[in-house]
Amino acid sequence: MHCTLCIDLPISKSIANRLLILQALHGDSLLPVSATNTPDDVRLLHNALARIPLLGGGEGVFLRNCGTAMRFLTAYCAQLTGCDVVLTGTERMQQRPIGQLVAALRKLGADIEYMGKEGYPPLHIRGKKLPRKAVHIENPQSTQFVSALLLIGIPVTTNITSPYIEMTRTLCHQFTHLQIYKSTNSSIES
């Protein structure tokens, strides 16, 4: 007896969100998303990435309470020349810290302004070309701060290791053929 079984598994939102940023950075068409098995966070990031190039004059992108989109888009928009956008979200999103990521991006010359409480969204970002020099994040409040920088090609040093940082490194390496992280517990390089 021959039996065939097809299972439609949901995609990994951790992988899909990273790939969406990498695709946008490299000018590739964004992964198609379906309404049936694509997590809401992935659809939200996909839609934001499609809209951002069309925006200007500080128009807002509402990211609900999606921390991944807020962190990854903060880095993405900061390095996107000509981008002029406000990233915002729910009241809960405006209580989620993002100061370490903004500080690291500002060290590279990013033009990011807090629209409310210092260290928290909403953020007004005016994108420009950023240098690819190393930054350090000590005890990051979120490994996504490190991943956001890695995704835009910024070398990072930190005192932590994480499977999510390792996943980002692997995806960047596979996507761009660059090794941007060394698991030495402290060094990430391009």
Question: How should these model regions be labeled?
Answer:
Residues 1-190:
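Structural preference for solvent-exposed beta-strand-turn elements
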